[in-house]
């Protein structure tokens, strides 16, 4: 039950969460990070049951209030950096888009749904909440049906972390060019994709 349903005048009405982000300032370095992606994954895991939609502020780093950024990564609000480079949080939303069907598992660090066709989709996140930068390993075991040997299945894993799907790291490794070359932008776009195992 949603809180809104306890108020007769609001019961059953749509709730839309609009223009939210992890910080209210347009140049917060956290916006460009994997930590932001994990934080948003956790936040989305708590929003979906009673809300019709949610709208992250904003899709791209280039918008009228501040103009074109001076560097590709500057802590802008967007899911996509200047140069059409997807940030890690972009993938959080791409992964969540697949979570249709029935929620069968929700915890502090994961969400799994079962689709109508019998397949499963899940999102697992692992933020560094202690602020010390220490790695915390998250391990999941997938239990297959007893007769899985006679069935076809595929376990596809897409990873975004500090080493994969993280164009900010590559930009740092390139020396943080304010105006990256065409080849550097292409490289950052390529490494912005999740690692698939």
Segments predicted by a language model, with ranges:
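Broad structural signal for hydrophobic residues in well-ordered alpha-helices, predominantly aliphatic
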Residues: 6-7, 47
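Conserved small/polar residues in nucleotide/adenosyl-binding loops
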Residues: 1-5
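Residue-level recognition of the N-termini of beta-strands and the immediately preceding loop/turn
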Residues: 13-15, 155
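Short helix-capping segments at alpha-helix termini
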Residues: 7-11, 147-149
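C-terminal beta-sandwich/jelly-roll accessory domains of carbohydrate-active enzymes
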Residues: 125-197
């Amino acid at each position: 039950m949603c809180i809104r349903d306890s108020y007769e005048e609001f019961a059953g009405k749509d709730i839309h969460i609009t223009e939210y982000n992890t910080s209210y300032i347009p140049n917060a370095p956290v916006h460009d990070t994997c930590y932001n992606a994990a934080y948003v994954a956790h936040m989305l895991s708590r929003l979906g049951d009673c809300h019709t939609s949610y709208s992250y502020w904003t899709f791209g780093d280039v918008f009228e209030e501040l103009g074109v950024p001076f560097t590709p990564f500057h802590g802008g609000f967007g899911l996509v950096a200047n140069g059409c480079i997807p940030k890690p949080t972009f993938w959080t939303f791409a992964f969540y888009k697949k979570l249709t069907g029935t929620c069968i598992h929700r915890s502090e660090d994961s969400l799994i749904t079962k689709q109508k066709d019998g397949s499963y989709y899940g999102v697992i996140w692992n933020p560094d909440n202690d602020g010390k930068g220490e790695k915390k390993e998250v391990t999941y075991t997938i239990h297959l049906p007893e007769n899985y040997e006679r069935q076809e299945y595929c376990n596809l894993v897409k990873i975004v972390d500090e080493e994969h799907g993280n164009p900010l790291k590559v930009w740092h490794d390139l020396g943080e060019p304010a105006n990256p070359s065409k080849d550097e932008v292409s490289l950052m776009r390529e490494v912005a994709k999740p690692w698939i195992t």
